[in-house]
From Swiss-Prot:
One of its GO terms (biological process) is cobalamin biosynthetic process. This is Nicotinate-nucleotide--dimethylbenzimidazole phosphoribosyltransferase. SUPFAM superfamilies: Nicotinate mononucleotide:5,6-dimethylbenzimidazole phosphoribosyltransferase (CobT). One of its GO terms (molecular function) is nicotinate-nucleotide-dimethylbenzimidazole phosphoribosyltransferase activity. Pathway: Nucleoside biosynthesis; alpha-ribazole biosynthesis; alpha-ribazole from 5,6-dimethylbenzimidazole: step 1/2. It is an enzyme of class 2 (transferase). The active site is at E317. Belongs to the CobT family. Its EC number is 2.4.2.21. Pfam families: DBI_PRT (PF02277). It comes from Shewanella oneidensis (strain ATCC 700550 / JCM 31522 / CIP 106686 / LMG 19005 / NCIMB 14063 / MR-1). InterPro entries: Nict_dMeBzImd_PRibTrfase (IPR003200), Nict_dMeBzImd_PRibTrfase_bact (IPR017846), Nict_dMeBzImd_PRibTrfase_N (IPR023195), Nict_dMeBzImd_PRibTrfase_sf (IPR036087). Catalyzes the synthesis of alpha-ribazole-5'-phosphate from nicotinate mononucleotide (NAMN) and 5,6-dimethylbenzimidazole (DMB).
């Protein structure tokens, strides 16, 4: 695998047209700032796409699935088999994310990044398997560095296919029993925080299970401390196959100047790694919502992110990212279609 396939050339967005963009927003038939966060969202999209017509084309939801060795220790209310069952549910159209994607006209793709046993006999699952579940991170590395590189390369090919098809917005969701443990460990390692500030109740575990989860994540961080010399090494030691591929896909999408809609705690952990690898990724990220997982707010603050929604969600699957899509479309539509004061013959209030 060539090194060129693993590096990402991501341009920072240009702020040269900010005055033009902001004036266009301010001269719409409304008081300045009256559309709140939709105005800052329109500015962000216009920085990426240019100050003329904004476009949301072929928006696509990517749900990355993988299993985690640590799940065998009972860190979730559900066993690892549920990952397989939910991936099958996605393929058959029965999950919350399927319902929301149908309602909103979002294309949905489900990627098997490495669940314990693949779903067979069902169409609609993309095979990008890196293994049959990761290593148990409190006992061994999750995967090798070569595996991280392979995951990034697969993710780049996935994004390239969508880019070539004309898609300019990708939303990120995930499924993997045990992945809040992995995400919390990644957060603690990169942000240099106490584990207790990062580990939460995930699927709704009780206090006894939470204490066990906390101990195992602390053990994982201690075990791999000397090996975690950079963000890719953090992924190799602590990550999930789905977190690795989300990270690579976010890097690839930013490289192609696509809008990247980030879902909840696990997707934000992938975004944290992506931004640590290349800070320019941050310009392309739209954070959909603040989840109930306790570490999520800290990660959002670290990334200087203001999420669009706060609905008390803790499901994952990309559900929050899907629900944010109409707001992103509304930001583009008001920018494109709303009359200016001069167009409407109204006295300006700027």
């Amino acid at each position: 695998m060539s090194q060129s396939s693993l590096s990402f050339q991501i341009e920072p967005v240009s702020k040269a047209q900010d005055q033009v963009i902001q004036q266009k927003i301010d001269l719409k038939t409304k008081p300045p700032g009256a559309l709140g966060m939709l105005e800052s969202l329109a500015l962000q999209i216009a920085r990426i796409q240019g100050p003329q017509q904004l476009q949301i084309v072929k928006p696509t939801m990517l749900v990355f699935a993988g299993d985690h060795g640590i799940a065998a220790e009972g860190v979730s209310i559900a066993p690892s088999e549920v990952t397989h069952q939910m991936v099958q549910n996605f393929a058959e159209g029965g999950a919350a994310i399927n319902v929301f994607c149908r309602q909103l006209g979002l294309t949905l793709e489900v990627i098997d990044c490495g669940i314990l046993t693949p779903v067979e006999g069902v169409e609609g699952i993309i095979d990008q398997r890196l293994g049959a579940g990761t290593g148990a991170i409190h006992l061994e590395p999750a995967m090798s560095l070569d595996c991280v590189d392979k995951g990034f390369a697969m993710a780049r090919e996935l994004i390239e296919r969508h880019h070539q098809a004309g898609c300019n917005l990708v939303a990120f969701g995930e499924m993997g029993i045990g992945n809040t443990s992995s995400a919390a460990a990644i957060m603690a390692a990169i942000m240099q925080l106490e584990v207790a500030d990062c580990v939460g109740r995930g699927t709704g575990i009780n206090s006894e299970t939470l204490a066990r989860k906390l101990t195992l994540v602390e053990l994982a961080l201690l075990s791999h401390q000397s090996a975690m010399t950079g963000p890719k090494q953090v992924l190799a030691c602590l990550g999930g196959f789905e977190i690795v591929q989300m990270t690579g896909a976010m890097l690839a999408a930013a490289e192609r100047k696509m809008l990247v809609v980030v879902d909840g705690f696990i997707a934000t952990a992938a975004a944290l790694v992506a931004v640590t690898i290349n800070a320019n990724v941050r310009d392309y990220l739209i954070f959909a919502h603040r989840s109930e997982e306790q570490g999520h707010q800290r990660m959002l603050e670290h990334l200087q992110a203001k999420p669009l929604l706060s609905l008390g969600l803790r499901l994952g699957e990309g559900t929050g990212a899907a629900l944010a899509l109409p707001l992103i479309q509304a930001a583009a539509n008001f920018y494109n279609q709303m009359a200016s004061f001069s167009d409407a013959g109204i006295e300006a209030v700027v």
